[in-house]
UniProtKB/Swiss-Prot annotation:
It catalyses: L-seryl-tRNA(Sec) + selenophosphate + H(+) = L-selenocysteinyl-tRNA(Sec) + phosphate. NCBIfam families: selA (TIGR00474). This is L-seryl-tRNA(Sec) selenium transferase. Converts seryl-tRNA(Sec) to selenocysteinyl-tRNA(Sec) required for selenoprotein biosynthesis. GO terms for molecular function: L-seryl-tRNA(Sec) selenium transferase activity.
Amino acid sequence: MTTETRSLYSQLPAIDRLLRDSSFLSLRDTYGHTRVVELLRQMLDEAREVIRDSQTLPTWCENWAQEVDARLTKEAQSALRPVINLTGTVLHTNLGRALQAEAAVEAVAQAMRSPVTLEYDLDDAGRGHRDRALAQLLCRITGVEDACIVNNNAAAVLLMLAATASGKEVVVSRGELVEIGGSFRIPDVMRQAGCTLHEVGTTNRTHANDYRQAVNENTALLMKVHTSNYSIQGFTKAIDEAELVALGKELDVPVVTDLGSGSLVDLSQYGLPKEPMPQELIAAGVSLVSFSGDKLLGGPQAGIIVGKKEMIARLQSHPLKRALRADKMTLAALEATLRLYLHPEALSEKLPTLRLLTRSAEVIQIQAQRLQAPLAAHYGAEFAVQVMPCLSQIGSGSLPVDRLPSAALTFTPHDGRGSHLESLAARWRELPVPVIGRIYDGRLWLDLRCLEDEQRFLEMLLK
């Protein structure tokens, strides 16, 4: 060991001496003596490695308390951190999908703070059913006979198949064998449910006769899967639920549909592309329809199954139902969200998902122009800050080919180096409230469709 190396090692402080320093008193009060000591030991080991490998001291050795505070502050941050979503995707799966209405947030807080009548009947002091209130709401909103709630739509599809078709065949068009995020595939779900997939037709064309020829004595269901996260266009053919129901009645085989996104209102009245609604499919004669709570419906993550009373009863009594049931927080948020649908005239104001989807490009453009000046003043030395038109997407596999006109703030490096964009995006991800945009075509884009809190946005970006 050289004299220089020995000198560097000698500069490393003893833990006891550090702990006696007044700057560590508040750290010990905040994070606990044990955790502070553990981290100091770890940092001493790191410092010794740096000395051994590079013959230098780490820069943070100049202020141990500051480094400990920085590390423990970061460590104490929740893994689920609030972010500002300016990606242009409204229902961003990786960012938690639908924002909850204030009524839903309040309902969840109340359910967390207090015992609630989750499975308790106040009328007769007996045991109630956790789905009952929500089922009644869904029946009122959609006109269905009954409903069942589980923790997400994948669970809804699994339960629907396991309870009604285990050990039998389910007929599905080859063009509807979807895969969603996380490698969730309809054929895999069928195997888990104990069903045998009988695929018919081709990728782009399936006829009624394809279903007819597939039905045999072991057929339990005819199934439609809404291709909500992709679109097959061109030379195509598919039969709709009404035609499939007519065939099912003729062959005495029920029809079920995995709708995926599931909107309870006609989106076209808000100027958005129309998406199939559960109540329309039930009115057409479909026995069961499953859909998500946290996509176009705008509520919490949940799987909702609506349909015929006798079919729902089979789902409720299946052993999987208990394993897949939703908890009280989910049910509280979903009930509060569904109650908003009882007053459709205020829905686009009170339901965040619909409010964000219906923001006009003109309003977003004005917002972008208002924000451009302070950001250009702050970043103008390195980047050209411009207002540019862009297209938002709905996200989470909803209306995959449809785009919403919007406006963005774009940041283009004066020297044209892409590494500067990556560096800027990384800096924004390290903010107390990270700002998430997207890099495309030599620019960093901040689509402002989902920006409602301008003050917080400016506080973050002007730091």
